[in-house]
Structure formats: structure tokens, C-alpha cells
Amino acid sequence: MDIKRTVLWVIFSFSLLMLWDNYNRYTGKDSIFFGNAGKQEQTAAKAEGKGEQPVSDVPTVSGPVPANQAIPGGQAPAKSEIITVTTDLVKADIDTVGGEIRRLELLQHKESEHSDKNIVLFDSVAPRTYLGQTGLTGGEYPNHRSLFKVAPGTREMGDGNQVQLVMEAEQQGVKLVKTYTFTRNDYRIDIKHDIVNNTNAPITPSVYMQLVRDGGKLAESMFYSTFTGPAVYTNAEKFQKVTFDSIEKGKDEHIKKANDGWIAMVQHYFVSAFVPKSDQPRDYFTKKLATDMYAVGTVVPVGSIAPGETKSLDATLFSGPQESSRLDDVATGFDLVKDYGWLTIIARPIFWAMQHIHAVLGNWGWTIIALTVLIKLIFFPLSAASYRSMAKMKLVTPKMTEIRTKYKGEPQKMNAAMMELYKKEKINPLGGCMPILIQIPVFISLYWVLLASVEMRNAPWLWIADLAAPDTLFGSYTIFGFHLTIGILPILMAISMFIQTKLNPTPPDPVQAKLMMWMPIIFSIMFFFFPAGLVLYWVVNNVLSISQQWAITRKIGAPTT
């Protein structure tokens, strides 16, 4: 039996199955392997207190607020006014109703390489709803539906390092003062909540922080999908994703109580998160607010506040790109929002190496090429062993064909004769496939690094404007309802795969031989949908592999065509 070819066919078949599974999820169907995909992204709540939804009276009405709509709790109608704060990185619109962040524009990130529009995370313009809200709960206290007064002050950072916005609201003798602090070159917004008890009795309010978002996902390729939805992190349970679908079905399983942690709303390349600064007990919740409207939040008790006393609770709101250089400074475990898949332990060192290479070369395209060469050098001995085995197999292919013909219909005798041939020619039938199998985790990890890294987004290289998008050199077309971009890299990929096929031993089975000839075309079509950075890696890797394999094959004396 040709074990190597069997293993390669298993890998190829599994790859096609995974692509079909991705297509099912892309079209809204259940996963072949996991059924409801959301179930695999949840952690069962087994610890004490994790199975109960926190009891709170956080206002559930969210989304765009008409100017004349009555405020819950018997307040008079509020007149909404938008206060805009501009820094070097963001432009934030904050509503005087609730002190709610209604719009957050990222000034350093465009929607696409061909667009002059900036990425907008928080937004309240239909059909998008994505908001950051905080307030008090536990009584008739100011919340994200209350009208706030704004203190005078500058709204432009200019040449300074910080800009502050101070807002206050009072209800039933309880005053809430919110202070937003924006800092230069930072996507973190510090939010200080000062609670003043102007009543004649003690109060025990809690501060809630929640992110509200519609359930819409960003446009993606059918060949790869990334997580969009809420997440909860605690030191005990680590990073827990919660899908919109699980919230819809009431099956949102995550930790409900902890003394630390944070909540986030994650999407491809970007994230928003509330991080309470104090380590004290808090509740975590996810819930459906309305049709296609969901929230993830935390409720942090402030403790008893005596009459005339003031207590404070500080928090940080991060809303920006998942740039690795910034994530570690936000909170413990915050780097986990950058999804490297199930081989994170390998992916992180790969990206670390890429960052250092990029610091020298200054371009992500050349960085990918340099990294490919580096990985190829690391695996050079394994690859050489694989190619030597394949070259020897190619030399004995005529003898193997004779054995198959001689013992046709007698598999036991045929296998015995094959093993005798391997022994005589000193060929290890697994010698060609084992080095390939060892390298597969590295290839998968690099795939996720290139897919998840916002650093590659809108990064140019030669004719390519965006390494995170497909190569569009020859234009874009719609074929059978699919948006297809035609570029030179997938074509080069097909050519390199065709050359590799010619260097490998020809399968004795005519059907297998024809399928092997079609594989370059099949894979090149797939790679038309893949990010240019990923295709660039495969093209360079194939060129290096062809050079190494050709040299070894020629040295051993096997035919090279």
C-alpha cells in the first residue's frame, strides 16, 4: 500500500470537508461537526453561581432614542444633544441622554483600501446599532436614559495629551457624575463614576456597564469565518465567547459572578470592552433586548453610601483595532480577543517573529516573504527527508507498477511484495508524509495569524493595496451569485502546484492521476477568495519547495518531469 499517498488523500479530503463546513456556516446552516456552532464557543457553567442570571434592574430599552421619548422612571422628556470629542485616533459622539456613546469613528482605519470613509464601531444609524452605555441600578437613579448636563470645556485634543468630558445627572436626590478622559495615541477611554448621595438615607447602588449591538455580522468570504459577538473574561474561567444565537435561544452559558474580569463585543479585527478597574464582586449578563438586539454587561456594586457621602467607581472602555501592541495594556487576558484558532500556542510566536521582522523591513508583504523563508529554513531537514523519500519512490515507481499488475486481486501478496521492495531499496513508506504532517500545525497557525491580524489590514505590497483582502489585479466579477476577484497570485499558485505535481511520483491509478492534475485548478479557484497575504505565503513557500525538491530529485537521479 502507498501509505504516503493515502495520508495525503486523507488530508485533502478533510480540507474539502472543512471548506464545505465553512460554507454551511456561511449560508446559515448548522455545522457538520458541531451542529449549532455557538455551542462549541460556550463554556459550561458548573461553578457556584454560574448557572443563574444576575438579578438586576438594568434598563433594557436601548438603541436610538427619539428626542421626545419619555424617560423610564417618570422623568420628563429629555432633549438630546450630541457632544463630539476628537482626538488623534477617534471621533466620539456622546449623547446628553444617558451619557451614551452613540458613534465612535476610528480616524486611522479606512473601511477598505478603496474607501475614503473611516471605520465606525459604535453607531446608531439604521440598520446598525452598536452602543456603549453605563449608569446606576438598584433604585430610581440616573441611568443611560437620564438627561445629563455637560460641564464646559474643550472638545478637541489639539496639541494636548488629554481631553475630558464631564457630565452629571440627578434623580431622587442621587447624583451621578461621569468623567470621560481621552488620551493621545490611546483607544482607551477612562470613565469615572462619582455617585453623590444627597438624600437623607443610605443608598446601595450598583454601576452597570453594557455593550449593545445588533446581531448582524460583517461581510466575509465563504471560505473563512471569524467570531462576532459578546465575550466574558474572568481569571477563573478565562475567555468565554457567547453567540447571538445562543442568547436568542436562552442557552447563553457563561460565568455569572466573579471578583474580576471584563466584558467585550468582538468582531473581525476590532473589539469594544468595558473593564472595571477595581477587583470586587460583580455580576455578568448577556440578554436579548429586542428583535436582533443583544447586550453583554456587568453590574458592580458600589456599597452603602451614607447621606452626603460620595463614592467612585472607575472603568476603562477600549474601542478600537485588535493591535497586539495595545491589547496587553488593556487588561489581563485581553490579548485573547485576537482569535488565532486552536493552535494559539504556535500562532503567537509566529506573530511575534513577524513583528520583529516588520520592525526591520517596514512592509508586511516583505515580512511575509521573509517569514516564509525563515520557516522553510527551520524545516529544511524535514523537507529534505521528505523529498528524498519521494524521489526514491519515483525511481521505483515502475517496479511498484509491476508488483500491482502481477498480484492484482491478491492484496496480501501485493503488500508483502511492496514491503520487500521498500526494504531492498531502503525506502521508508512514511518518510515522505511524516515531515509534511509535522509542518501542518505551523501552516494552519500561520493561516490564522494572517487572517486575524489587523496589522495586515489595508497593508500594501507592490501592486496589492490590501494584504488582508483578495488580490484584485485583474478586476472583480460576479459569477453565479459569487463575488470573484481575479489576481495574479492565485494564478501563480496554480502554476506552482502544477510544477509540484510533476515533481511528485505519478499515481499508478489513472483516476488518481487525473485528480492530482485537477488539484492545482481546484485550489487556485479557492485561493481567489483568500486574503492576498495568505496566498503570497503559499506562492513563496511553493517556489522554495520546488527549488529544494528539484535539486534533491536531480541529485538522486530520479526524473524531474
Predicted segments — roles?
Residues H144, H358, P441-P460, D466, ...:
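Juxtamembrane "helix exit" motif at the C-terminal ends of alpha-helical transmembrane segments
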Residues P490, G533-N542:
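Hydrophobic core segments of alpha-helical transmembrane domains in multi-pass membrane proteins
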